[in-house]
Amino acid sequence: MTKELPKTAKAVVIGGGIIGCSTAYHLGKLGWIDTVLLERKKLTSGTTFHAAGLVGQLRTSANITQLLGYSVDLYKRLEAETGLGTGWKMNGGLRLACNEERWTEVRRQATTAQSFGLEMQLLTPQEAFDLWPLMTTDDLVGAAFLPTDGQANPSDITQALAKGARMSGVSIFEDTEVLDLEIDKGRIRAVVTAQGRIECERVVVCAGQWTRPFAARFGVNVPLVSVEHQYIITESFGVPSNLPTLRDPDRLTYYKEEVGGIVMGGYEPNPIPWAANGIPEGFHYTLLDSNFDHFEQIMEQALGRVPALENVGVKQLLNGPESFTPDGNFILGEAPELKNFFVGAGFNAFGIASAGGAGMALAEWVTKGEPPYDLWPVDIRRFGRPHFDTDWVLTRTLEAYGKHYTMAWPFEEHSSGRPCRKSPLYDRLKAQGACFGEKLGWERPNWFADLFANEEPKDVYSYTRQNWFDAVGREHKAVREAAVIFDQTSFAKFVLKGRDAEAALSWIAANDVARPVGSLVYTQMLNDKGGIECDVTVARIAENEYYIVTGTGFATHDFDWIARNIPAAMHAELVDVTSAYSVLSLMGPNSRAVLEKVTGSDVSNAAFPFGKVRTIGIAGCPVRALRITYVGELGYELHIPIEYATTVYDVLMAAGGELGLFNAGYRAIESCRLEKGYRAWGSDIGPDHTPIEAGLGWAVKMRKNIPFRGREAIERQLAGGVKKRLACFIPEDADAVLLGRETIYRDGKRVGWLSSGGFGYTLGKPIGYGYVRNPDGVTEDFVLSGAYELDVARERIPCKVSLSPLYDPDMARIKA
């Protein structure tokens, strides 16, 4: 007897692959038993049935590593819970290094694993061979082994998750295609299928490569692309079942044991997109035609590593499309465009490894309104305007696929889809030697080459100090001793206006924004746990109007957070004005002298002190000047209507020549902010860190009886203390290269890892920031009393610790 579709549900999950089934399983575990999963055809029939099934855990993010580790823990127990086999085996994962640069990368990965509490053993070529005797090792420098990695049967795990979901009361319907969604006032109300209509509170779209076109029908952007992905399955030739999985990135290949044979695939540099104009009707349990010519480049690499493959029969060259994303990370979370519409898609061929944790996190997001921990690297709100364009997404995604196994260089930039968004100054800066990076489509000058000295404005990547090190040093010196201009046009800029603007922003912002017109406030915006969701500058430009500035990459995220947290009864409207203004940041001890030469406005310290915003005129152009800095010097952010930008820039450069005015880029900003101790959202601070833990308690209005979101959590921390605290670390080895994720040791015990790292040119030393953790509590005395070391690429380096800024701790230069 066919089960009848329910009329109502708390949540409807669309898609019956491993991600959808994991999400449904975890929704059931959280008590949402009136959850319904709808699959257009059969469970696993989209992509899951042809996935390779390798399960690795280590990523560059601690929380994504934790999420993948949860998958492993779930897969270990799932068979016992459901009675269904999963094919899970924890045979470990081996990663090879065939040159010194890759070996440095692997050693840094081992440090990262150690930081995150994941075991990773460094091996000699002989030790690697002992674990994987099918391979040649003549070119090996070393290898790494993660004993808790493994492999699984994707279809079996999915069926086990589906059974577990049913055991909790979740209903699953196959052959039930979703035809439409009913939406009222920007919120999901119902799901419509051929079998009936289901009223629901939440929709979770886990439809794999169908997700982008489906979501687009409702105004939701999910930037992913279907790409052909091939691997071979060999005949059995006596391969032991406990053989570890193997990744050989220098040869672009991966391997796992399969019924006494081998599965071998790889990531070619010239991938083939699929179904760019739409997925064909009836595409389920379907594979693409094998492309032997295209796979030949992977096969040649594999034969060089595993010569036995030359004499083994191949059962199948399997070609199945997988969904990939522009940055190689999957996509989770509630869509900023539509309330109650959640997404879990774009898993870049590591969906099996991710599924357990992704389903858990997505279920918590659905039921509690937020994920269990900060998932910014995979948050759907990390995308922006360029990601609406299918051609741009395709171009960037193919580049990301091709880099899957290439060296993961520090500071590496994408080259595809550029230039996309350009400041009005782009051509001028390019002609003056700018080497551009890209963020959210914006071209941003990272550093400037000295063209007169025949420097080339091009990054040369390495794990040592890169070719731009001295150039950034010149810019840093100019910031500290003269003046520079940073083109920061890419800043995201919003206006909040309306009769309740002050009341709304007072609720959202942790700092006091109820200040007079002309005031400028640095503030965080907190979640209910006190975690930092946004880190912004707020200028009050009129009685009922605020101008809000945030980082380039946070445009979608921060706009969504602010808009969602405006209390429903309040009259306040948020508008994105990013493209209306250019931003020239004039910074350095000579910045006021430069400004005085080009404006008739009084910019003296008395008339225009730190923390204020003024409208001034420059060459007939109206300029909103913000007296603020992110480099630790006297300075001004000049926000200029975009049509005036080149005029203002030219006037400033002409006036500043005799005062040492210099072009400078984002890498100089980074080195200066490290010296001054400014925090960076996404690394040093985020939803898992409170202002108290981050040393930003001074920016929270606890002395005023003003309610704001997160206040109760901050009160609890102030009363009970914290278990982690952000500190600054200065290695004794001036040549150490700090990149972030280096392990922090206090008195020989691992207590954390660096959240960010770089070099301070004024100090002449590397600088790192990271949280010192202790389950029994962390006080200032606890931090300052320890003897510290940093593990850098598996070498311990003694270092000093500080809780105060290393540069201008009294802020005398900023307030001059």
Outline where the language-model segments fall:
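Flavin (FAD/FMN) cofactor-binding and adjacent substrate-gating region
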Residues: 74-77, 89, 98-174, 179-187, ...
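Glycine/proline-enriched, intrinsically flexible loops and inter-domain linkers
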Residues: 373, 380-816
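Glycine-rich FAD pyrophosphate-binding loop
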Residues: 28-49
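C-terminal catalytic lobe of FAD-dependent flavoproteins
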Residues: 154, 250, 259, 281, ...
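Beta1/beta-strand and adjacent pyrophosphate-binding region of the FAD-binding site
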Residues: 4-19, 36
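Flavin-dependent oxidoreductases
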Residues: 22, 62, 180-289, 297-308, ...
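Dinucleotide-binding Rossmann-like beta1-alpha1 core, especially the glycine-rich loop
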Residues: 53-131, 250-255, 259-261, 282, ...
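Central beta-strand plus flanking loop segment that forms part of the substrate or channel wall
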Residues: 52-57, 93-95, 209, 218-241, ...
